[in-house]
Amino acid sequence: MAQHTVYFPDAFLTQMREAMPSTLSFDDFLAACQRPLRRSIRVNTLKTSVADFLQLTAPYGWTLTPIPWCEEGFWIERDSEDALPLGSTAEHLSGLFYIQEASSMLPVAALFADGNAPQRVMDVAAAPGSKTTQIAARMNNKGAILANEFSASRVKVLHANISRCGISNVALTHFDGRVFGAAVPEMFDAILLDAPCSGEGVVRKDPDALKNWSPESNQEIAATQRELIDSAFHALRLGGTLVYSTCTLNREENEAVCLWLKETYHDAVEFLPLGDLFPGANKALTEDGFLHVFPQIYDCEGFFVARLRKTQAIPVLPAPKYKVGNFPFSPVKDREAGQIRQAAASVGLNWDENLRLWQRDKELWLFPVGIEALIGKVRFSRLGIKLAETHNKGYRWQHEAVIALASPDNVNAFELTPQEAEEWYRGRDVYPQAAPVADDVLVTFQHQPIGLAKRIGSRLKNSYPRELVRDGKLFTGNA
């Protein structure tokens, strides 16, 4: 790989020399930072198995190297530099994989280590969604996830990724993460706080990441991180697991934040060592059992991960003063819910007891049951999946529900050719050589549901959402 020139402030280099353990070479650190980052992907096991994915992509000649801490994660090498962007491949468009940096797969691995099986999880700083979607896959779309994002502009991206991956057990919120300790005390079995940080570990992806770096900025960020971890710890139930992570390298934003929590709450905080998380984890292990990943250790981004358990109750914070407002949804009555379920099944949409029907005016929604305890405590940006809109002639089934709930083996499923699938993703109607029989057609490609179409004569009317329509070169190679 070609080198690229990374900007390093002198004070940063001094700080890294002091922070780096004697077992590591500082020259190796500098050399690793100058190398471009290896690309990596994670197979979405909600949609396919790793074995089936490897078989499906074998003809492409990709070199996929397993990532030690994530069974479904791979570093990827491709022959041609001007190859089709990974985001334009059919497998990415249908949600079979997520483009995710290898080290960012570590926090979720830590969250579910040692057989941990949480039922209600919070991702405090969730956008763009790599870790939320990874958590959902580990939970197999069961239970419930509260995915919060403080930046309003990033909530839309977060939802798009959740929808593409076929995830149904997520509620989205748009809050400052510091409110949750007071708003939802002891409500979560597990919490991931991938904290906003100075980003010192991302220089391999962004050589100018340290242009605005300063020790003073680190201190300001660490102060915010302490407030965030304090809030998260209050929101964690007794016996629950909290994972704290950053993509930065200084001790102040990493070890010091965790040690501050321990000093504040003493025996209520138990550090859970991560030395056995994966083979070779001991290379990054600190004396407190955290993983401080310098980029030269595993040839990835710099990263920090700590796992802790709440072993004692702590004083409750004062209740928040904000008003949530009236919840605009109401549960669908059992009889009507049965009729809706039957109609949905006729077009290939099915769901289990983890989801419950709610309605708002003419909209029908499916909410994860595990999130209902939070209604009235927080204001949601989006909850579960929108199933349908009702109209005089029945139901207008929603694209996100098709991606999350449809079975490609349903009687109305119709497999498109690559050229037809590409037309579908471009938002155009499809004219198959042999028209399907059903009026409501479950459109599939590579045996994956990619939408629902109305058959009008020999034409399949495109219902692909306008905001998702793709231009340019796609997987058949035609622009």
Swiss-Prot record:
It catalyses: cytidine(1407) in 16S rRNA + S-adenosyl-L-methionine = 5-methylcytidine(1407) in 16S rRNA + S-adenosyl-L-homocysteine + H(+). It comes from the Bacteria. PROSITE patterns: NOL1_NOP2_SUN, SAM_MT_RSMB_NOP. It is found in: Cytoplasm. S-adenosyl-L-methionine binds at residues 125-131, 149, 176, 194. Coiled coil: none annotated. Its EC number is 2.1.1.178. GO terms for biological process: rRNA base methylation. GO terms for cellular component: cytoplasm. GO terms for molecular function: RNA binding; rRNA (cytosine-C5-)-methyltransferase activity. The keyword RNA-binding applies. Keywords: Cytoplasm, Methyltransferase, RNA-binding, rRNA processing, S-adenosyl-L-methionine, Transferase. InterPro entries: Methyltr_RsmF_N (IPR031341), MeTrfase_RsmB-F_NOP2_cat (IPR049560), MeTrfase_RsmB-F_NOP2_dom (IPR001678), Nol1_Nop2_Fmu_2 (IPR027391), Nop2p (IPR011023), RCMT (IPR023267), rRNA_ssu_MeTfrase_F (IPR023545), RsmB/NOL1/NOP2-like_CS (IPR018314). The active site is at 247 (nucleophile). Pfam families: Methyltr_RsmB-F (PF01189), Methyltr_RsmF_N (PF17125), Methyltranf_PUA (PF13636), YebU_pre-PUA_dom (PF21150). NCBIfam families: nop2p, PRK11933.1. Belongs to the class I-like SAM-binding methyltransferase superfamily. RsmB/NOP family. PANTHER family: 28S RRNA (CYTOSINE(4447)-C(5))-METHYLTRANSFERASE-RELATED, NOP2 YEAST -RELATED NOL1/NOP2/FMU SUN DOMAIN-CONTAINING. Specifically methylates the cytosine at position 1407 (m5C1407) of 16S rRNA. This is Ribosomal RNA small subunit methyltransferase F. It comes from Escherichia coli O1:K1 / APEC. The lineage of its organism: Bacteria, Pseudomonadati, Pseudomonadota, Gammaproteobacteria, Enterobacterales.
